[in-house]
Regions:
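Fold-independent oxyanion-binding glycine-rich loops
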Residues: 7, 48, 115, 134-137, ...
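Short, acidic/turn-prone active-site loops that include or flank metal/cofactor-
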Residues: 31-32, 159-160, 182-185
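RNA substrate-binding interface of SAM-dependent RNA methyltransferases
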Residues: 29, 33-132
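Structured adenosyl-cofactor binding patch, chiefly the S-adenosyl-L-methionine
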Residues: 164-206
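Residue-level detector of anion-binding/catalytic polar loops
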Residues: 1, 67, 176
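N-terminal positively charged helical leader segments and presequences
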Residues: 1-33
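Active-site/ligand-binding-proximal alpha/beta "capping" segment
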Residues: 125-168, 175-178
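Short connector loops at helix/strand junctions that flank enzyme active sites
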Residues: 11, 21-23, 37-41, 149-151
Length: 206
């Protein structure tokens, strides 16, 4: 028997009936299982990092329970793709999401937003709920914040972080700057540390 999921929250038990060169035919058996998603609805706004680092962020963010990942071109992003190359990369990230769901037992695929520039996203998204900016020089730690409700956005920069202009735009849009301790973290470490801490404080890690 194998387990199959539809990406929308449902998992089935199945048995393999036929194996062909290009397909496998399964017979669905057993009860339908609806798996619970995390109670904390997190959207990760991730400044696009270099290939292997971005893959790691996407993979681990899924395991840590994000509901949505929004890739953003930022001033310090070291890779800028267009056209077919961007489409190929987006399909690759979608594959990383599917593989991560298979590994961690999630039956609902997190959304992968259409890649856009940071400024375009800021101008086109006003219904965000509480928003947090990972900012090493902030004086505010997560422990000082009140529980924000069940829907939040987390903004993490690429290698080198956000530029001064990008930080100013985030703060003017209502983002709250937070630090993750006294050490400067790599982009992949910062995003994942923030997600784990938020799930511990406000989500299903507790």
């Amino acid at each position: 028997p194998v387990s199959v999921f539809d990406g929308k929250g449902c998992e089935h038990r199945a048995t393999v009936k036929t194996i062909k060169r290009s397909e496998i035919i399964l017979e669905i058996a057993g009860a339908l299982t609806v798996l619970q998603e995390p109670s904390l609805d997190i959207t990760l706004l991730q400044g696009i990092a270099r290939n292997d680092r971005m893959d790691l962020i996407v993979q681990k963010a899924v395991e840590l329970g994000v509901n949505s990942i929004q890739p953003l071109w930022m001033q310090r992003s070291q890779t800028h793709l267009k056209g077919s190359r961007l489409e190929k990369r987006s399909k690759h990230w979608q594959g990383v999401i599917i593989s991560a769901c298979e590994q961690c037992g999630r039956a609902t695929l997190p959304d992968l937003g259409t890649t856009m520039t940071y400024s375009d996203w800021m101008l086109s998204n006003n219904d965000r709920g509480p928003c947090f900016l990972l900012q090493p020089d902030s004086k505010t730690g997560l422990g000082a914040l009140q529980p924000p409700g069940n829907r939040i956005h987390v903004l993490a920069g690429p290698e080198g972080g956000l530029s001064d202009d990008e930080q100013m735009l985030a703060r003017s849009a209502g983002f709250i700057g937070i630090h993750l301790g006294p050490r400067i973290l790599r982009t992949e470490t910062a995003a994942l540390a923030a997600l784990a801490a938020m799930q511990t404080l406000w989500g299903d890690f507790n």
